[in-house]
Amino acid sequence: MQYTQQAAAVTAEVNKAVQGKQQTVNTIWMAMLAGGHVLIEDIPGVGKTTLALAFARALDLKESRVQFTPDVLPSDLVGFSVYQKETGKFVYHAGAVMCNLFLGDEINRTSSRTQSALLEVMEEGTVTVDGVTRPVPAPFTVIATQNPIGAAGTQMLPQSQLDRFMVCAVMGYPDEEAELAILAGQSKGRLLDRVRPVAGQADLLAMQQEVSTVFVHELMYRYIVALAQASRKDPRLAVGLSPRATLALTSMTRAAAYLAGRDFVAPQDVTAVFDVVARHRLVLNDQARAGGETVDSVMQDLLRTVPRPRPEKADRHGR
């Protein structure tokens, strides 16, 4: 694993701008290494945007940011064509997603039509304007933030779009020491200005390639599928984990193993990332919600009741 030290340097650099959020930083970094997209859900003012911009700086990525409001149009994201009389041709003007890291702030404040414009980009890595399909630059990651449902001016993202985010991370308030560090650091200048590039686009692509080669034993595949099957049969859930979710869980476990310095996935990798992969995909039914159940309690039950493979069976030589 040639780039593991450089991968660790990225998180160290991002942590300069975001105090006390190591777990959230690791979650986003694993999703980027796995080639996925990230949804960050929390109240305003806890550092969601700063965190995304810190990754763009640490990785020297071309970033673009859109503050989603009801008047943002799909063409603002994917671009548009303009007819030029001089040449008699249509000229394409790139939209905001033509970048390496696209930050969509408060995605659940915009229209469903504009939200849907992200679907092709997130799933296919392309945009289609006037019948012409164009690839987005590689690497490409969407980091979207949303305020909790019920906040003024918000609307629920459709389940089809939620499922396209590999993970959903929650920031939460900083603890007392972290908040004091934020105040002390801010007095010496913007925390984001401390972040320096420690890798580039080519390095990220190389890391993603290394992550894709991390070995997954058949027993680990069976464990992941068993968790998904159990979620679909759980009487408390109206929606369980989709096949796309099992693919996301597998990719995230590879990234977790990679950051741990292993070339194979172990059972602890699955349990470490299960909540961030599953939380936004599982939907409680009305009866469970009325009974006080939570998605978190269901996830804990799934991890407790589905048998885990023995760790020694997980490597390349396991039987």
Place the predicted regions along the sequence by residue.
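Walker A/P-loop
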Residues: 32-69
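Pre-Walker A (pre-P-loop) alpha-helix and adjacent loop at the N terminus of AAA/AAA+ ATPase modules
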Residues: 2-43
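P-loop (Walker A) phosphate-binding loop of NTP-binding proteins
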Residues: 43, 77, 145
